[in-house]
């Protein structure tokens, strides 16, 4: 996990994939970002 980006409002945090729109959840065993309605992008 780690190395992921979370653009958008309430973004941030660490994750395996990239998420846009309110941060969303993390992946790859990393920690998810804060915020709801997150979309998985450019995984």
Swiss-Prot record:
Subcellular location: Secreted, Cell wall
Cytoplasm among keywords: no
A biological process term (GO) from this entry: cell wall organization
Cellular-component GO terms for this entry: extracellular region
The keyword DNA-binding appears for this protein: no
Induction: In response to mechanical wounding of plant tissue and probably also after pathogen infection.
Keywords in alphabetical order: Cell wall, Cell wall biogenesis/degradation, Repeat, Secreted
Protein's name according to its UniProt entry: Glycine-rich cell wall structural protein
Species classification: Eukaryota, Viridiplantae, Streptophyta, Embryophyta, Tracheophyta
